[in-house]
Amino acid sequence: GIRGLIQDIALRRGWGDVLAEGVKRAAARIPASEPYALHVKGLELPVRDPRAKWDTWTLGYLTNVRGGDHLRTRSPAEYLLRGTLGPLEEELGVSEEFVRGMDMPEGLKVAIFGEPPQRVSIPLMAKYAEELITLINAMGVCIRPPVLRTFGPELFGRMLEAVVGLRIRPEEVLLAAERIWNLQHLFNLREGLRREEFRLPDRFLREDNGNPPLEERTVEEALRRYSQARGWREDAVPLEEKIASLGLWEEASFL
């Protein structure tokens, strides 16, 4: 049964030795199994199905540096129970008053939420959420919705000032997070990552599960806008000016 299989995977016994490599590598060895290997960039997907709700969180399955991870692209303004407004926007899950009080640069708020705040730009929020969670990880804070909704670059700058005695502006804090994210992405590119791997399993694009399949053009348009926001080419390689602005020339020298 399942309990025995888990033990086989842990001890690499029999088929457990194959499955211990993860579903991507296992599917390459098990005939006709690839349609059932639900992963992005080799990481198995969490329980949330993007056919039910296409939003910042599910775009993050494609964009984040680990692959199909549910902890790197959580929006601080998500609305879990409502639908999507289109390939590029989702409904706002917090009040206008809450948005105005968020710890986020004002220009970024307008770009993501509009003025007055009415909706959420999925690609722009994906970039911001990734950098916010990068800060949370770097500062050793737990990633929970209350933290996402209350912590931001201003607070993190004050925390750093309290510890090291240096006043760090919110813009500098976000730039550091962007540098970390791009450094991880450059590592992946160096190790062979290609734009073609920013792709959901075909079943999400072909099969109806009570929700219609996602349209591939929806996914691709969101990815295109995300790459623009990141300062990347459409093949997911950072532009020279982005590399220069982040001081990552040495790390990007392999490109």
Language model features with spans:
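Extended C-terminal regions of large enzymes
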Residues: 1-255
